[in-house]
Amino acid sequence: MTSGPQTILHVCSRDLIRQLRDRILASHGYSVVSTLSVTEAEDLYAKSHFDLVLVDVEGDGRIPQAEKLCSDIRHKDPEQKVAFVCNYRVSKISDCPNEIIRSEFNPDAMIEGVKELLG
């Protein structure tokens, strides 16, 4: 068990949204490491511990990329918590993620989803 704030790896291809979410998460006491790139997310994950990997799945081709990232992470650590952030239905075929947080334009819903998932 670690002391200090819980750490979130936030993956979002939309820079403005990424920055906004990072600020919202930080204002609620979370330590946030974020990236625009799935490839960079994999590198960051390999180097550090994260309590949650939060992946934005909005945009063309983002769901398959997010599912692959989730699968790769779970292969390395089956206990890692992963959540997708979206405002529409995501495929239920995948065993990833732990949670789908539907909160695209609602910061309170995003924080509530994160809190529920992290306990």
Where are these regions (language model features)?
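Phosphate-coordination loops involved in phosphoryl transfer and adenosine-cofactor binding
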Residues: 3-6
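Short acidic, S/G/P-rich loop/turn micro-motifs used as interaction or catalytic elements
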Residues: 14-17, 55-62, 89-90, 107
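Two-component/phosphorelay signaling modules centered on CheY-like receiver
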Residues: 14-33
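Acidic, metal-coordinating helix/loop segments flanking the phosphotransfer/catalytic sites
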Residues: 36-52
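Conserved phosphotransfer cores of two-component systems
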Residues: 46-48, 72-80
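Conserved phosphotransfer microenvironments
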Residues: 54-75
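Output/docking surface of receiver
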Residues: 83-119
